[in-house]
């Protein structure tokens, strides 16, 4: 294609620009020997390429493409332009939708952690977490139960929190048990409005209650893969048929008061420990198979407890004075 032809095409473009002003729409302009396809914007633009290659023009708003083509190639060029633009816009729309989906997923994930949490008030002072879990189990899956105890007297304050597996189950539990009778008292069940510091109080009372009846001993068994609702008393009861059991404790998160999925059982002698390892390892407690190991006590811990083997994520760290031995059960 000659330079004179290109100059003529550009001149036609300039003439169309001057005559059509801001109301001009993209169209096909026919000539005797060629056809000019272009998109027009009323803003100023800059020529950055010359015919016969596509003319790429840039404005201060959006990029526009001008094409010069022979008469026999006009239809295919127009199709390619339209397909290219549609593909670009489709990719942009998909990108925006993807970002919105990711953001929505993040918000849903952040909100879902507390959706099933319920406040339960006016409880009988003698009710235990295990008993409350069994009651609310009629409404669905119970993830966690926390009863609040007085700091000084270690007596139940008559309220607590129950976390259900989903928001639907929480609503079902609220409908079933709000204003119902439990142990001769009319309980109140609703979604909690916990005052500042309330969660820390729940955590402290739960851990204090957990350690209150534990009898320590140098002869201990480490128990992993515990059910999330298993209490220290429940763990001790599971070993009730074993000789020489002194106590049991489940380890909880310091910040949240939730079970970490492992604990310890203390015994009177090393023989009792070996007997429990041989008998109870792999036994199911609340639907989960116990993973037992011999635990030993450090007299003067000077370093952090060693990391456990790969895959033991819930047992990633122990209390500072307790470690796992290399003895396999």
Swiss-Prot record:
One of its GO terms (cellular component) is chloroplast stroma. One of its GO terms (biological process) is mRNA processing. Pfam families: RRM_1. Residues 116-194, 219-297 form the RRM domain. InterPro entries: Euk_RNA-bind_prot (IPR050502), Nucleotide-bd_a/b_plait_sf (IPR012677), RBD_domain_sf (IPR035979), RRM2_NsCP33-like (IPR048289), RRM_dom (IPR000504). GO terms for molecular function: mRNA binding; RNA binding. Keywords: Chloroplast, mRNA processing, Plastid, Repeat, Ribonucleoprotein, RNA-binding, Transit peptide. Residues 77-104 have a biased composition (Acidic residues). Signal peptide: none annotated. It comes from the Eukaryota. It is found in: Plastid, Chloroplast. Could be involved in splicing and/or processing of chloroplast RNAs. This is RNA-binding protein CP33, chloroplastic.
């Amino acid at each position: 294609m000659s330079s004179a032809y290109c100059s003529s095409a550009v001149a036609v473009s300039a003439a169309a620009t001057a005559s059509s002003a801001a109301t001009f729409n993209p169209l096909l302009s026919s000539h005797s020997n060629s056809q000019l396809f272009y998109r027009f914007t009323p803003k100023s633009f800059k020529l950055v390429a010359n015919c016969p290659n596509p003319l790429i023009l840039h404005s201060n708003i959006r990029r526009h493409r001008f094409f010069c083509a022979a008469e026999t190639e006009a239809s295919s060029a127009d199709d390619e332009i339209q397909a290219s633009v549609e593909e670009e816009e489709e990719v942009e729309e998909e990108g925006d939708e993807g970002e919105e989906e990711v953001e929505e997923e993040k918000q849903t994930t952040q909100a879902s952690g507390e959706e099933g949490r319920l406040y339960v008030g006016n409880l009988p002072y003698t009710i235990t977490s295990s008993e409350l879990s069994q009651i609310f189990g009629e409404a669905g899956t119970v993830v966690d139960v926390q009863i609040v105890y007085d700091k000084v007297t270690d007596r139940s304050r008559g309220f607590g929190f129950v976390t259900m597996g989903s928001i639907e189950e929480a609503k079902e539990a609220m409908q079933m048990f709000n204003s119902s009778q439990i142990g001769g008292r009319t309980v109140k069940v609703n979604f909690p409005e916990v005052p500042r510091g309330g969660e820390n109080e729940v955590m402290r009372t739960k851990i204090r209650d957990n350690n209150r009846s534990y009898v320590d001993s140098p002869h201990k068994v480490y128990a992993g893969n515990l059910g999330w609702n298993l209490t220290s008393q429940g763990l001790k009861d599971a070993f009730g048929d074993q000789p020489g059991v002194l106590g049991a404790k489940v380890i909880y998160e310091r910040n949240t008061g939730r079970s970490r999925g492992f604990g310890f059982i203390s015994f009177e002698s090393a023989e009792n420990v070996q007997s429990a390892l041989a008998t109870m390892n792999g036994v199911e407690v609340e639907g989960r198979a116990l993973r037992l190991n011999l635990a030993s006590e450090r007299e003067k811990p000077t370093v952090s407890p060693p990391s456990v083997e790969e895959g033991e994520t819930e047992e990633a760290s122990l209390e500072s004075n307790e470690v796992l031995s290399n003895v396999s059960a």
